[in-house]
Every structure is written in C-alpha cells, then in structure tokens.
Amino acid sequence: MTELPRIHPDDYCDEDLPRLAQPWWQTLPGNFHALPDHFLADNDTRWRIDYTASIDPLARTGLASMAGAAALPASLNISRQREERALVDFYRPFLQEEDPNTFFSRPTQTANIERIPVAPYHFQPEDGDAHTLRFRSPFEPKNPALRDRYLGHRRNRTAWAQHWRHHGEPRPTLIMIHGFVADPYWLNTRWLALPWFYKQGFDVLLYTLPFHGRRKGRFAPFSGAEFFSQGMALLNETFAHAIHDLRLFMDYLREQGTPAMGATGISLGGYTTGLLAALEDDLAFAIPNVPLVSIMDLMQSWFPINLQVSLLKKVYGTDLQGLREITALHSPLTWPCKVPQAGRMIIGGAGDRFAPPKHSHLLHQHWGNCDLHWFPGNH
C-alpha cells in the first residue's frame, strides 16, 4: 500500500511570499529572511513540524557562531577590505553573460584518478566494491589576482570522493554532495540512507567539497571553515573549484561507461546541486534537499552571524541588494535549469530553520513549479 505524504505541496501557505522576478537580487524584498513559513497540517503533523523547528535554532546558533568567528578576522582587516572591493568587481561582467559556463569553465585537462579501497568501517557492498577516489586538481582561479592566494591552500588542491560500484555492467550513478561541515562519508551514508539507493541499482559517488574533509587546511579550526571565511571574491572561486573538480569526476564516470548520472545534495550540497543543474546538459535528474538559494538572506536569519551583515555592507560599500549581487554568480536562482522538467525535484523540511522552506519555495518557482516534496522535519 502506498503511503501518502503528510504534507501536500499546496499545504505551504505562500500568500505573503514574493513571486520570483529577475534579477532576483534586486526584486527580492529586504525582509525576505523574516517572512513567515506556514503550513496547513493536521494536529499530529503540526506537532512534528513545531517540535523539529524548535530544535534547529540551537544547532544553527552554534554553527553560525563557528562560521562567524572564522570569518571575522578577515572582515576586520582594513587593508583586506579595500582589496576585496576591487576583487569583487572582476566578477560583475560574468553576471551579464547568458551562459554561466563563461565563468564556470569546463576543465581543459584530464585527471589522473587514483582508486584506493575504503577502510573496513565504510559501506562495503556485497555485490560490488567501494573505493576512495582522488586526483591532483588542475583548477586555477579565473581571477589572476587571487591565483597565488587560492592555490596556496595545498591540501585543497587534491580532490576526493568515495565511489560505490556494482560488479558487471556500469549502472546509473547517483552523485551525492554533502552539506556545510557535514562531509564525513560515514555520516552521509547513514543519515541519507545511501545504501538503499545502491540496492535499488544505482552506483553512488559521494563528493567532497573544497575546504572540507581531507581538503581542509592543516590549521583550519573545523572542516569547511575556509569555505566562507575568505571573502566573497574567493567564495566565487571556491564554487568554481567545486564544479570544476566534480566535472572531472563526472568525466571519469562517463569514461567508465555509466549510462546516466543525476545529482542530489543537502543544504550547501543542495545549493551546489542547483548550480550544477544550470551547467550540465546531460544530468538525468537534480534533487536539491533542503537547499538554500540566497546566502546573504540566509545569513540574515542566522544569529549571531546576522550581526556581521552590516559589517559586510561596510566592507563592500553596498547595501543588501549589492551583497546579493556579489554572491549571485553561484546562486541557482540566477541561471536557467538545464535538467528536463521530469528530472527536477526539490525536498524541503517544513520545520527547517537552517534553510527555511521559503528558500525551497523560491527554487520551486524558478524551476517551473517542478515536483516538490515537503517532509514534517527539520534540517
């Protein structure tokens, strides 16, 4: 018997939310982060939503404190502030291009990918094998002024992934992109029930984002600390690097004969999945899971990092619209989705207070009102 979802897509009350209009960074209201998220639900589902929503703020505050503390020294550096204003100007012309691949260039070199058997505590398929993949990334920043600084992160220049592969003929591959700080393969394996997808016949690739896991700097305080803490210009390059290395892994999968590939990701990984869906012509599906879509609006809803938004306005000499524009280059809202309509799906948590439902709602509009699944839980 098929179990019906507890929350129907139409149960989200969006009467007070804006209709998406481009350029979104100018048309989105300044109080978007504070607009309510309401659902029609029966008493049991309402209790589940409210209970899970009450849990998120505590964890969110802890994560925001960590991220804010990591970013604060760079924000307070006066000489770095003047340099940052000049650096972000380099990226403005790319926003005017029709093709996002003008900035997110396809790799021009191949990768020599090494396969290493995974440790025994990782998932071990009975009818296949599991390997760690790695290669020396040939990525170079688009902005020459950032080349030395970015490439100075030597550990970040090795790309990592874990690959589960069935014996016999190549299978369709599910690409999984983790969230901010949530990079451990074992965590995503269990939390996202990835062995279930493997047992349905998918090969699985778990991709490690830049500055996470073994790509983390030796002295970084936590995994992912350097992802957002080095200024908005370098953040653009970080997303370019994330896409570049993932594309090299995808090229490898094509060479191995995989008949199809699709991507899913959670939170920051959902954001990256949305970006990838605007760049790749042959993704069979894209399923962002509790995605964010505007980094600056998300920051405004996270205490205490929301206190740094006014500092960022001062650093970059702009307002909220200007900060959104600086980060729009990598937002899924900026570019048309290339995945066929039938292959698009968004998963949102009704009680999510990390990436609130309004973010999923915006992406749902942008993706032509594609399939949308709400679950009565949090991030």
Would you name each region that the model predicts?
Residues 353-359:
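Conserved alpha/beta-hydrolase "acid-adjacent" motif
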Residues 339-340, 345-348, 352:
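Short beta-strand/loop motif that positions the catalytic acidic residue
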Residues 272-319, 374:
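Hydrolase active-site cap/lid region
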Residues 1-145:
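N-terminal targeting or regulatory segments adjacent to alpha/beta-hydrolase or S9 domains
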Residues 361, 369-379:
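Histidine-bearing beta->alpha loop at or near hydrolase active sites
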Residues 264-273:
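Gly/Ala-rich beta-loop-alpha elbow adjacent to hydrolase catalytic centers
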Residues 153-159, 165-174, 199, 339:
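Proline/glycine-enriched tight loop/beta-turn segments at coil->beta junctions
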Residues 176-241:
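Cap/lid segment of the alpha/beta-hydrolase catalytic domain
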